[in-house]
């Protein structure tokens, strides 16, 4: 991984599929407000193709509209975590926090059509293109087996934070996540 820098970071929230409007879903708007209160710029806007979250649509949007670059921190939740990982195969970012990440389509056709799972993951490139990688996993996630998160953590060397929540991190706030981001960006 790259050495951690202390320049001002921008946070980009990459939601799970189906989370639209984004500001009414889960902890996304709460995180944006909380970061703004701490002086951190945060992009939290509706994604194109919000239900299927196709890689061919999301990655150009993240690069071109969200302006992902070497000073951005990606916060990817569920499908957004997979989008973050695929983006980091080719794009340098400041870091990423992956929430409820997986590495397979779990045998679910609607996940397979997203395009994230149709080839091997480039784990080494992901690591090389980020200064830090943190991962939150629910040991009792109703959608993603915990073993999926462990596989991602083992391949990326993430700082794996495991919680027993049974909710796929689908809550209205997420104080631990805010604390993690602030610690990683040096604020």
Where are these regions (language model features)?
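Short, surface-exposed "cap/lid" segments of acyl-processing enzymes
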Residues: 7-51
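Active-site nucleophile loop of the alpha/beta-hydrolase fold
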Residues: 16, 47-50, 97-106
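Short glycine-rich catalytic loops that host catalytic nucleophiles or stabilize transition states
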Residues: 45-48, 161-167
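Catalytic histidine-centered segment of alpha/beta-hydrolase-like enzymes
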Residues: 53, 166-176
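Short beta-strand/loop motif that positions the catalytic acidic residue
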Residues: 129, 134-137
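Catalytic active-site module of serine/aspartate enzymes centered on a nucleophile-bearing elbow/loop
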Residues: 173-187
């Amino acid at each position: 991984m790259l050495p951690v820098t202390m320049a001002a970071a921008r946070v980009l929230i990459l939601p799970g599929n189906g989370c639209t409007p984004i500001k009414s879903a889960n902890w996304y708007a709460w995180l944006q407000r909380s970061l703004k209160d701490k002086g951190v710029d945060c992009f939290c806007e509706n994604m194109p193709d919000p239900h299927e979250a196709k890689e061919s649509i999301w990655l150009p949007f993240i690069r071109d509209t969200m302006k992902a670059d070497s000073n951005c921190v990606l916060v990817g939740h569920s499908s957004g975590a997979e989008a973050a990982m695929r983006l980091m195969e080719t794009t340098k970012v400041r870091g990423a926090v992956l929430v409820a990440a997986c590495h397979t389509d779990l045998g679910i056709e609607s996940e397979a059509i997203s395009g994230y799972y149709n080839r091997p993951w480039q784990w080494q490139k992901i690591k090389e293109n980020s200064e830090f990688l943190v991962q939150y996993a629910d040991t009792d996630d109703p959608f993603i087996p915990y073993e999926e998160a462990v596989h991602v953590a083992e391949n990326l060397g993430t700082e794996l934070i495991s919680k027993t929540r049974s909710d796929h991190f689908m809550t209205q706030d997420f104080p631990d996540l805010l604390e993690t981001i602030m610690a990683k960006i040096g604020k």
